[in-house]
């Protein structure tokens, strides 16, 4: 089917791929594609879907967690190609702030998938959505940033959030991590909410073993073995 290029996440993965390909081959052409794609992604951050947004205009304005999460990882993957330390640091700083200080809810111990533009909670299906696998994936991204910056405080925070999220998302009756959850415990919009998907557990095992390697936290190792 012919589909308009509405999804900015295709661009982020392409950017990382071309950056790694440029490093592997030394190709300036691939490096230039990575640089231009990186610039376009940053320019589209405030309105990533542009004219192809499916939401009804003027209703439930939201910002999503997925974008700052993937941008912080992308910045790490392309920094050697971009060769602009100030831009990379600024991009990472902004993304880490959004993840840790805005989307993470300490009183709940989880990261929200969607918030109001001002960072407040929204009481609707999308606004109550929790995706434990997404949260845990983001935490090992933050651990990698902590390694790059020699920032033990950030690593410890990522481990703390990881352990909180995996406890929240774990199915105590049957085992495994739920796909989607509702922060108020209501039924979710997604019919597949209780499926135990492979990628969720893959991201979780990475977060747990990386957390153990970096901090020696035995609880991370116990969860890794359990997974």
Stretch-by-stretch model annotation:
Residues 1-227:
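Glycan-recognition and catalytic cores of secretory/periplasmic carbohydrate-active enzymes
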């Amino acid at each position: 089917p012919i589909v308009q290029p509405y999804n900015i996440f295709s661009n982020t993965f392409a950017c990382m791929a071309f950056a790694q390909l440029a490093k592997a081959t030394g190709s300036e052409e691939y490096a230039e594609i990575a640089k231009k794609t990186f610039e376009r992604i940053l320019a589209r951050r405030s309105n990533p879907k542009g004219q192809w947004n499916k939401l009804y205009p003027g209703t439930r304005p939201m910002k999503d967690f997925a974008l700052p999460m993937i941008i912080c990882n992308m910045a790490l993957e392309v920094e050697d190609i971009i060769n602009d330390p100030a831009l990379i640091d600024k991009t990472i700083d902004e993304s880490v702030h959004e993840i840790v200080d805005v989307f993470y809810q300490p009183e709940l111990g989880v990261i929200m998938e969607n918030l109001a533009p001002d960072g407040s909670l929204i009481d609707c299906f999308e606004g109550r959505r929790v995706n434990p696998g997404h949260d845990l994936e983001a935490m090992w991204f933050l651990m990698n940033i902590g390694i790059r910056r020699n920032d033990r405080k950030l690593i410890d925070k990522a481990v703390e959030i990881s352990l909180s999220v995996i406890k929240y998302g774990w199915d105590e009756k049957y085992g495994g991590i739920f796909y989607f959850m509702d922060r108020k415990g209501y039924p979710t919009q997604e019919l597949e909410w209780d499926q135990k998907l492979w990628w969720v557990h893959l991201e979780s095992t990475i977060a747990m073993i990386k957390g153990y390697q970096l901090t020696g936290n035995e609880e991370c190792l116990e969860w890794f073995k359990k997974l």
